[in-house]
Amino acid sequence: MNAVLMWMRRTWMLGIVFIIIQCLTWFRYQEAYRDWSWTISLVQGATMLGSPFIAGVCAYMVHRQWPRTTRRDLAGTGRSHHLVSDMTWAVIAWGWAAQAVFLVIGCVSCVVHHADSSGLTLPWQLITGPIALGASAWLGTLAACLWDSVMTIPVMVLAVFLALS
């Protein structure tokens, strides 16, 4: 866990970028605070913008921090699988933190404005966004480990975006 926190400290600017991505969807719909299902859908809908970004970030970080020669040299050590997993979990944690912040903001605004909760389907709306964000991060990490090319990053961003749209 300490390695994940170290990577989170090193990549603190990703938290700000994920907050901006959440803001892009949140402030587009002004009436979201009057309906619970709209509010939660907007928070989880930002996954469509965040998932391609997180896949590209993970692919970039693998190429930048752990090039193929370094991964090959450390492959015999006991912690070789932690090389990219700690970094990926840190990126996922920033994405989940941004979703949690906007989920709290949305819930507070819905409570304050006495929003309608008739269309609320909580289990699916709260689970699918974080799972998709995590899956995109691991997909970007896996692609960067398997395909050692600069083209991995734009290909991952485009592929995840097209898969979600």
Feature-to-residue mapping (PLM):
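Secretory targeting signals
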Residues: 19-53, 58, 88-158, 163
